[in-house]
Amino acid sequence: MNYHNITTDDMRNGDGLRTVLWVAGCNHHCKGCQNPVTWNPHDGLIFDVEAEQELYNKVNKSYISGVTFSGGDPLYPENRDTIFHLAKYIKKYIPGKTVWLYTGYLWEEIRDLPGMKWIDILVDELSDVTYHWAGSTNQRVIDVQKSLKTGTVILKGE
C-alpha cells in the first residue's frame, strides 16, 4: 500500500483530535474530489515498517482520540489488508482509541468484509460537490459495531 501523509491534531475527520492516514488508491474518481492526487495507488510513499510505527506512535499520544483512514479510499482493494491490519493492531494494543474510515463504497457493499469488525465509525458514499460546507449531504456516519450487531444501518448517535 502507498500513502500520501500521516497528519496529527486533525479536528475535521472524526471526533476529537485525530491522527489521519491519507492513503493512495481510489477507483471512484468523484467529480470535484478534494484529493485527486490520491487516486493513483502507486503514487505517494510506500507504507513500510517505519511508516507503520510512525502511525502507531502518533495515535498513542494521550490527547489523540483515535485514527482516521482517508485518502484516496482506504477500502481500495489493494489497501484493505493493510488498513484492517492497522485497525486491528490499534484496537488491540492502543486501548481507548476510535477507528474512523472514510470510503466511497456503500455500507451495503462492504459490511461483510472481515476487517469491518475493527472499525468503529464508517463514513460511506461518494462525495457530492453540491454541498460545500460540511462534507456531503449523501454521506452517512455509520456506527459500525451497532450496525454489525443489528444487521441494519445505525447512524452515529442513534
Question: What residue spans do the PLM features occupy?
Answer:
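Canonical Radical SAM [4Fe-4S] cluster-binding loop centered on the CxxxCxxC motif
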Residues: G14-V49
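Canonical radical SAM enzyme core domain
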Residues: N40-E54, Y76-M116
